[in-house]
Design a protein with these regions (language model features):
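Adenylate-forming
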Residues: 8-14, 21-172
């Protein structure tokens, strides 16, 4: 059975799921980025694995649960025929971790690494099939498997090149 993440909120959850939500985004300065790079290299993990571990740990503490499920999106262009096609090819992956307070941080980090590698191996398995195969009772006010999604956009640059043209992101 998939655990439900009940976070303390200032309002009652509606009976039917809405798409109202919020997004939190941030940008790291160069010094923090370099520290993170050293850390992930030392522990032989990716930035995503680090942030998934952090998010799961924070959610675990806020919800006072030792079993947390978080969703993420993975590019779904595994087949050569999709490389030249326009459009978004993505699949939702589900991560379940147990960041208990008595567990050593590096142990949990390694668990998330193993979980991530396993998820990548099965990334072609459609999310809808997973939901159907688990065949759980479904609460109409929630996503069937998770309430929080982590998306890491690891953009090192603020511009892209298209042939002889250059597109630059301008912050306003």
């Amino acid at each position: 059975e998939v655990p439900i993440l009940s976070l303390p909120t200032d309002y009652v959850r509606p009976n039917i799921k809405t798409t109202n939500g919020a997004m939190m985004s941030f940008t790291m300065n160069q010094q923090t980025r370099q520290l993170l790079q050293k850390y992930v290299e030392k522990h032989q993990i990716t930035d995503f694995m680090f942030f998934m571990s952090v998010v799961m740990t924070l959610l675990s503490r806020y919800a006072r649960k030792d079993d947390v499920v978080v969703g993420s999106v993975m590019s779904a262009r595994m087949h050569k025929g999709t490389e030249q096609m326009l459009g978004m090819f993505a699949n939702t992956l589900v991560y379940r971790g147990q960041p208990s307070p008595d567990k050593i941080w590096t142990q949990f980090l390694q668990e998330v690494k193993e979980m991530s590698l396993e998820a990548y191996e099965h990334q072609e398995y459609p999310f809808e099939c997973l939901v159907n195969d688990l065949d759980q009772s479904h609460d109409a006010s929630r996503n069937p498997l998770f309430d929080v999604m982590l998306v890491l956009q690891n953009n090192e640059t603020n511009h892209a090149h298209f042939g002889h043209s250059k597109l630059t992101h301008i912050q306003h």
